[in-house]
Each structure stands twice: as structure tokens, then as C-alpha cells.
Amino acid sequence: MVHRKALAALGPGFAARGFARRPAPAAAVWHRPAAAEFVVAWVQLTRSPDAFGWYGSRFIIEFRRGAEPRAGVLGPGFRFCQLLDDGGRERVRAVQNALIRRLPPPPARVLRMLDDHARECYLAQGRQVTAAYGPDDDIWFRHRDERDLDAWFRLLPVLLPGVLDAVRRRLG
């Protein structure tokens, strides 16, 4: 569902900046030539979602320059939020916190089976992001359901033009 929504919401913005969609079934991957290489953008889902279903999952958007027009290409790169200004990162934090506020209480059965350290780490997923994100923070877009994804895919297309300007400056 993440890739489908990403393709619909972000595809027009990428196309307007000269990116073509990579013909990968059900994957949100775009590329454009950059001299003898390619700039590639893709949506990457976490490999470690919440196994207990409380706080959900997350995704990022990666940008890299490399020899091949495919997701995971080796080369210099950045993640979406590294390319935002302070205002853009604040908008991301606002959505992140809105999603966190909507979380239900953590499941008691899960809390009972975790040791103190694991419980603290688990509960941290339900705490608001109180400090402003910095340009070097590794920010993942959290989601539990379609409503959360809709919130992200309302915001991300608004931020995409500025991000793609930064991609052109930094990666070509």
C-alpha cells in the first residue's frame, strides 16, 4: 500500500523534474540521467516493523547517484529529510507527532513480556518528538494505517520540489 500511495502522490512531482518511473512492479522507484550516471529515488520500507502491531511501521525515501537506474544503487546519497530546511523538518515533526498522538495505549500483554530495557524502548515509540529534527537526524515516516499514510502523502508532495532542487545541487 505504501508504494501504491507513493506512486500516486509523488509520481507527478518526480515526472515534472525529469524523472522516469522505474518499471518495477509495485515499487516506487524513479530515475533520471545525471551525466554518465543516474540519480535514483525510491521508497524503502523498514525491515523491522512493530511485530506486536502497536506503533506500526515506517518508510523513508532515498536518493542516490550511481551507475544503474535501480533502487539500492551504490553511490553518494541522501534521505528525504536530510534535504529539507528547518521549516520542512518541522512540518514532518508535526505529522509524526499527530500520528503518535493517535496511537492507542500500548498492549499490556506485550509490556508484561518485555524486560525493563526492552519495555522502555518499546514505550519510547509512543512519545512525542519534542526536540526539533536536525539535518543529520535519520527520520523515518511512521504509519499504522491508511489514515497515517494519507497524512504523509498529503505533505510529502508539497515538500518534494524543494527536495528535488537540493538533489540537483548535491547529486547532479
What residues fall within each predicted segment?
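Intrinsically disordered, low-complexity regulatory regions enriched in serine/threonine/proline
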Residues: 1-9, 21-172
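Acidic, metal-coordinating catalytic segment for phosphate/diphosphate chemistry
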Residues: 14
